[in-house]
Amino acid sequence: MVEWTAAERRHVEAVWSKIDIDVCGPLALQRCLIVYPWTQRYFGEFGDLSTDAAIVGNPKVAAHGVVALTGLRTALDHMDEIKSTYAALSVLHSEKLHVDPDNFRLLCECLTIVVAGKMGKKLSPEMQAAWQKYLCAVVSALGRQYH
């Protein structure tokens, strides 16, 4: 279980309050697929991902970005039980979808870049530290089935 200070909880909540899932989700997944092209192998049914423009204009990529961020947002309401909250998703991604668990980390890195771009100087080092701790807890929970 991850231990959270009151300040860390406030910082994570503050970051989430600045995130528009419908905007940041697609941007984060698009960035992930472009910067780390090997992650595209899990999205063959999404159609054309052959160019940056194709990825950015792909409605299935955008929709899945929203799904991914909506799922990530779930942890905010379950910060004291993140591992159990993501147990079923961990099983799905490992046993059925066979997703490399490092891809969760890559997506979260891309999300942090998107969030930092949106928040600018309002994303203080303390806020970022709490945000990174939150993302690491979720990534660990999603990768739990692989251990």
Swiss-Prot record:
Q: Which Pfam families would you find in this protein's record?
A: Globin
Task: Return the SUPFAM superfamilies for the record.
Answer: Globin-like
Q: Show the Gene3D superfamilies listed in the entry.
A: Globins
Q: Which intervals hold domain Globin?
A: 3-147
Per the record, the GO terms for biological process are: hydrogen peroxide catabolic process
**PROSITE patterns in UniProt:** GLOBIN (PS01033)
Q: Which UniProt keywords apply?
A: Heme, Iron, Metal-binding, Oxygen transport, Transport
**Molecular function GO labels:** haptoglobin binding; heme binding; metal ion binding; organic acid binding; oxygen binding; oxygen carrier activity; peroxidase activity
What family name appears in the similarity comment? Answer: Belongs to the globin family.
Per its database record, what is this protein's job?
Involved in oxygen transport from gills to the various peripheral tissues.
On assembly, the entry states: Hb 1 is a heterotetramer of two alpha-1 and two beta-1 chains.
Q: What is this protein called?
A: Hemoglobin subunit beta-1
Please name the gene that encodes this protein.
Answer: hbb1
